[in-house]
Amino acid sequence: MKTPITEAIASADTQGRFLSNTELQAVDGRRAAASMEAARAQKLIDGATSAVYSKFPYTTSTPGNQYASDARGKRDVGHYLRKANHGLSGQAANEANTYIDYAINALS
């Protein structure tokens, strides 16, 4: 997979040199941006999970594999949120309603 980081490393490697300070700073900047993006995504998942659990409180109080009484429930809410987000962002616009309906039906 080609990314700006891998291309910079490949370019420096073919030229037989180390990465320049500018290239290293760009790599660090991209890593920092990726870390911030991941933190924002986790906050969004936490908020969505809280909203689902407050609307459907029985999902956390009833034990069993089909309820969100453990970390798997939070993981699943994050999964459905990503699917809905991908659909709404235009990557698969016609699938957005399908995933949202599926998530709602799964929680009903």
UniProtKB/Swiss-Prot annotation:
Keywords: Antenna complex, Bile pigment, Chromophore, Electron transport, Membrane, Photosynthesis, Phycobilisome, Thylakoid, Transport. GO terms for cellular component: phycobilisome; plasma membrane-derived thylakoid membrane. InterPro entries: Globin-like_sf, Phycobilisome_asu/bsu, Phycobilisome_asu/bsu_sf. The keyword Cell membrane does not apply. The keyword Ubl conjugation does not apply. It is a peripheral membrane protein. One of its GO terms (biological process) is photosynthesis. It is found in: Cellular thylakoid membrane. Two isomers exist. Contains one covalently linked phycocyanobilin chromophore. Heterodimer of an alpha and a beta subunit. Belongs to the phycobiliprotein family. Light-harvesting photosynthetic bile pigment-protein from the phycobiliprotein complex. This is C-phycocyanin alpha subunit. It comes from Aphanizomenon flos-aquae. The gene is cpcA.
